[in-house]
UniProtKB/Swiss-Prot annotation:
Subunit structure as annotated in this protein's UniProt entry: Heterodimer of an alpha and a beta chain.
Family per similarity comment: Belongs to the bacterial histone-like protein family.
Protein name stated in the entry: Integration host factor subunit alpha
Gene Ontology biological-process annotations: DNA recombination; positive regulation of metabolic process; regulation of DNA-templated transcription; regulation of translation
GO MF term list: DNA binding; structural constituent of chromatin
Domain of life: Bacteria
Annotated HAMAP family: IHF_alpha (MF_00380)
Coiled-coil zones: none
Amino acid sequence: MALTKAEMAEHLFETLGINKRVAKEMVETFFEEIRQALESGEQVKLSGFGNFDLRDKNQRPGRNPKTGEDIPISARRVVTFRPGQKLKSRVEEANAKK
């Protein structure tokens, strides 16, 4: 099961007692800030969680799986996420308990 933005907003509503509309706006604003930073080429560092980085990938050869035809895969910029040590540790601990 995946955690959704709606579930995050609901959790804020329940734990902080703020109104649902405000909770939804907080979640949307959080993600919009991350989007804007990445769009402007900035790294996003969330202490205790991880880093969102931009990585440039060079053009490379590819192949159409249906036809076998060689096609170039164009150069592009991708977003990568590197989890922080605290997040890694918590995930490992949670998996060890299962």
